[in-house]
């Protein structure tokens, strides 16, 4: 059977096609999405689908929840409620880095930069914590920079940084150090009434010690009673300060009474050795040497149960040294140095060496005193400015200026800065020994060191210079200090009298001239009479009146010139404003003014003529519509 050609070709095309496997669709699996055995399964399925599809909550529901939250009224906070201070947990991250940077500046003795950096940080993204502020305040307190301390404290209060108990204690200490116990007690009362904090044991110790130092033992006793009312436990340190106040007042019975009171409150035995030194002084004052030495054995004997700190040892050493028992003090000092084992036990401190220095100096053993003073470094104690001043004062009082100047040279080696007392002490000692130039050099160094000597030190300098016939030097120091010191009339009279006696009346008048130019200085009538009298001696009694009249004339001319300058400035401003107005606007203003003037004169304005013409065209002068044809 034959097939046609067309059919054969069609058969070949069919064979040449590639066989394609037909993929059948998978059978439908019936999954029950809308039916669950429990609500928990349904919720779990919803959460799974949201995670799989990464679905977010609907926008409208999110906005609705925000609106509901915004509609909830917030409680109104009282702005007068004091803020609570931050906890130490706030000192992390950048704020901790800032704190460490401030500590670095303080270690470098750059307190001005530390305080300035703290101020600037308040308005930065890294606000300082109260702990950083307290660090700067404490450094300023140690260096007796009380003005800077109070300024920084006022600044942080305005900045809203809540103080903590340490801040309050530093302020109390500052006012007590500058002998302002009344202000310190006012701040304490405000703290008790308003602060959201409770006082600490350190608060009462600072107040009691400061009040005793300011000879206000009665107020210190009241603070002790207030301490008991507030529920604080009996503190032997507070009692030791009160006993010290009784010793200052030569009240031996008060010392023994306080000790008995403390002993009763502690159950019959005082195990803190801080009170035994003052108790020994009380016994020595009553000439009860036997009881004093028994107290000494009870405190530091071999079988003693009394806990002795460095401060307790210092009080005992002081009691022995001041009452003819310096040999016993030396034995105790040697034993204490052996017992000293930092950091486990601190048996000596800076005060220990100061007590021994005073004991050696009282016995005239100044070489031994300087040797003990230089041993501080061996026991990890660094002398401060007060320690140097204490020993230098003892040396200067005993005409040992050379040794005092050696100690002054050691201050720079130990990175200790002299203060006003240091320079004043050396200056006065130089004057006593007739070394006027050396004393004046110490004063000049003090001024160049940015220290602020008071008027009394300046007066002593001027007195010695005038007595030595160094009027030019005295005038030079006057010119240096007149803008730095608030001089009284006596200071002006002193230098003026010296100039007058030397026949230098022109220089005296120049001083008056400068006083008249200075608005902060008042030339009193008493001073004017003094100047007139000095001028009368030289036959120039009218010069002062001429000078004052000339000053009044110059002031009047200056005031008139100031008013003229202000008027010229005002005219210049009006000219500048006129220059900003375009010329066309100026012409329009002139034309408007001309029309107004013609109207007032009774003439007919062109604008009125135009309006009348328009009225005629519209239907007459009465404004009615024209009749229709």
Swiss-Prot record:
Disulfide bonds: none
Ranges of Low complexity composition bias in the record: 63-79
GO biological process, one term: embryo development ending in seed dormancy
Gene3D superfamilies the UniProt entry points to: Tetratricopeptide repeat domain (1.25.40.10)
Predominant localisation class: mitochondrion
Organelle transit peptide: 1-34
GO cellular component: chloroplast; mitochondrion
InterPro entries with a match to the protein in the record: Pentatricopeptide_rpt, PPR_domain-containing, TPR-like_helical_dom_sf
Pfam families recorded: PPR, PPR_1, PPR_2, PPR_3
Keywords: Mitochondrion, Repeat, Transit peptide
Region span, Disordered: 44-79
Compartments where located: Mitochondrion
SUPFAM superfamilies associated with the record: TPR-like
PPR repeats: from-to residues: 129-163, 164-194, 200-234, 235-265, 272-306, 309-343, 349-383, 384-418, 419-453, 454-484, 488-522
Gene Ontology molecular function: ATP binding
NCBIfam families according to UniProt: PPR
UniProt record similarity statement: Belongs to the PPR family. P subfamily.
Function: May play a role in embryogenesis.
Name of the featured protein: Pentatricopeptide repeat-containing protein At3g49240, mitochondrial
Species of origin: Arabidopsis thaliana (Mouse-ear cress)
């Amino acid at each position: 059977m034959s097939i046609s050609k067309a059919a054969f070709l069609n058969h070949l095309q069919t064979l040449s096609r590639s066989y394609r496997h037909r993929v059948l669709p998978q059978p439908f699996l019936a999954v029950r999405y809308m039916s669950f055995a429990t609500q928990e399964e349904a919720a779990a399925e919803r959460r799974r689908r949201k995670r799989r599809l990464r679905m977010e909550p609907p926008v409208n529901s999110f906005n609705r929840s925000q609106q509901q939250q915004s509609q909830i009224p917030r409680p109104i906070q009282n702005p007068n409620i004091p803020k609570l201070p931050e906890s130490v947990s706030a000192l992390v991250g950048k704020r901790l880095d800032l704190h460490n940077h401030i500590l670095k500046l303080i270690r470098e003795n750059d307190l001005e930069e530390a305080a300035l950096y703290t101020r600037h940080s308040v308005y930065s993204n890294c606000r300082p914590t109260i702990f950083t502020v307290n660090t700067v305040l404490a450094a300023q307190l140690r260096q007796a920079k009380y003005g800077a301390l109070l300024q920084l404290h006022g600044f942080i209060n305005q900045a809203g940084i809540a103080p903590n108990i340490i801040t309050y204690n530093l302020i109390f200490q500052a006012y007590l150090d500058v002998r302002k116990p009344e202000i310190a007690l006012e701040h304490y009362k405000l703290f008790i009434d308003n602060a959201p904090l409770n006082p600490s044991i350190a608060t009462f110790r600072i107040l009691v010690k400061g009040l005793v130092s300011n000879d206000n033992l009665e107020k210190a006793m009241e603070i002790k009673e207030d301490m008991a009312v507030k529920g604080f436990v009996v503190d032997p340190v507070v009692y030791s300060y009160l006993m010290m106040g009784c010793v200052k007042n030569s009240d031996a019975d008060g010392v023994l009474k306080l000790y008995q009171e403390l002993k009763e409150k502690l159950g019959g035995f005082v195990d803190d050795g801080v009170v035994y030194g003052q108790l020994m002084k009380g016994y020595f004052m009553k000439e009860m040497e036997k009881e004093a030495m028994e107290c000494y054995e009870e405190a530091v004997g071999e079988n003693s149960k009394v806990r002795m700190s460095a401060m307790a040892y210092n009080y005992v050493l002081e009691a022995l040294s001041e009452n003819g028992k310096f040999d016993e003090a030396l034995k105790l000092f040697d034993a204490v140095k052996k017992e000293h084992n930092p950091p486990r036990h601190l048996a000596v401190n800076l005060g220990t060496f100061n007590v021994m220095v005073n004991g050696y100096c009282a016995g005239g053993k100044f070489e031994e005193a300087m040797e003990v003073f230089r041993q501080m470094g061996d026991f990890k104690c660094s002398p401060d400015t007060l320690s140097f001043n204490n020993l230098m004062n003892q040396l200067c009082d005993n005409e040992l200026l050379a040794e005092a100047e050696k100690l002054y040279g050691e201050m720079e080696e130990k990175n200790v800065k002299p203060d006003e007392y240091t320079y004043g002490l050396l200056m006065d000692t130089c004057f006593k020994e007739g070394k006027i130039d050396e004393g004046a050099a110490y004063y000049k160094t003090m001024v160049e060191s940015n220290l602020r000597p008071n008027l009394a030190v300046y007066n002593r300098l001027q007195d010695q210079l005038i007595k030595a016939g160094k009027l030019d030097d005295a005038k030079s120091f006057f010119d240096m200090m007149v803008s730095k010191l608030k001089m009284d009339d006596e200071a002006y009279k002193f230098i003026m009298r010296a100039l007058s006696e030397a026949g230098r009346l022109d220089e005296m008048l120049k001083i008056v001239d400068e006083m008249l130019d200075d608005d902060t200085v008042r030339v009193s009538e008493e001073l004017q009479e003094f100047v007139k009298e000095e001028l009368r001696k030289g036959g120039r009694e009218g010069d002062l009146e001429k000078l004052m009249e000339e000053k009044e004339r110059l002031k009047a001319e200056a005031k008139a010139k100031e008013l003229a300058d202000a008027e010229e400035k005002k005219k210049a401003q009006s000219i500048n404003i006129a220059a900003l107005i375009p010329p066309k606007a100026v012409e329009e203003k002139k034309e408007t003014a001309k029309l107004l003037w013609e109207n007032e004169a009774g003439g007919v304005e062109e604008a009125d003529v135009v309006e009348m013409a328009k009225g005629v065209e519209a239907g007459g002068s009465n404004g009615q519509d024209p009749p229709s044809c």
